[in-house]
């Protein structure tokens, strides 16, 4: 069975300081993200065991667990590359033009994205996604890692609103953490994902 693996960070733990502390990055990557990878692999093994032994009553709970752990793994894998010590500034080119078209300007996009992150109740994410059916950008608020998703939306930029992403450094000032992330957002990575996502086609007819 193919195993999910924890990706290496594309920079040192302390590379995003002072915006995100090295200690947070070390714990976030090495403990929390690693836990989702381990959980996804373990759940796949339990699903295989349940099928083999015909314990199909176990399937619903295992499917929920897989959605949680695997979505956590995928979102964190995107998140690390959405950040860069050489980040910040503004998007450019077609990405910038499409953000302006779909949100009425970069300031409005930034305010909406921050509000979606800040208003997350409990644990969740803010995500900029490409919606291929209407060929437009949307911002979605994800509950935990896997709920309240727009089906078919391709995540381009994600922001972790779980307490483990910021509490050691920012305590209850999560809005300050969200603001700090704009200094390290990796717009070339977002643009690369945007160009790839625009090639997708959804046949809904």
Locate predicted features.
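Feature for soluble, non-membrane regions of globular proteins
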Residues: 1-205
